[in-house]
Amino acid sequence: MARNVFCTYLNQEAEGLDFQLYPGELGKRIFDNISKQAWAEWMKKQTMLVNEKKLNMMNSEHRQLLEQEMTNFLFEGKDVHIEGYVPPTEK
């Protein structure tokens, strides 16, 4: 049976993650408050961010930047700014 959470990103009830995907307190907060749909949206943004800024996950400063962007995106409603990216328009 699917686990539902009130997703703070979508601001509605939605299917929750199956297990904690991120370590520590932030991981618990994500597990308790973020839906599968919101996490999938973050993963797309994260991939674009890593590629555009050429982030190296072996570099602790790059990991901290990515974690801050994740927190801003999922919990504070701030979109990830990717220079030169123009989102497709809805039809």
Swiss-Prot record:
<dbReference type="GO" id="GO:0005829">
    <property type="term" value="C:cytosol"/>
</dbReference>
<comment type="function">
    <text>Could be a mediator in iron transactions between iron acquisition and iron-requiring processes, such as synthesis and/or repair of Fe-S clusters in biosynthetic enzymes.</text>
</comment>
<dbReference type="InterPro" id="IPR007457">
    <property type="entry name" value="Fe_traffick_prot_YggX"/>
</dbReference>
<dbReference type="GO" id="GO:0034599">
    <property type="term" value="P:cellular response to oxidative stress"/>
</dbReference>
<keyword id="KW-0408">Iron</keyword>
<comment type="similarity">
    <text>Belongs to the Fe(2+)-trafficking protein family.</text>
</comment>
<protein>
    <recommendedName>
        <fullName>Probable Fe(2+)-trafficking protein</fullName>
    </recommendedName>
</protein>
<dbReference type="GO" id="GO:0005506">
    <property type="term" value="F:iron ion binding"/>
</dbReference>
<dbReference type="InterPro" id="IPR036766">
    <property type="entry name" value="Fe_traffick_prot_YggX_sf"/>
</dbReference>
<dbReference type="Pfam" id="PF04362">
    <property type="entry name" value="Iron_traffic"/>
</dbReference>
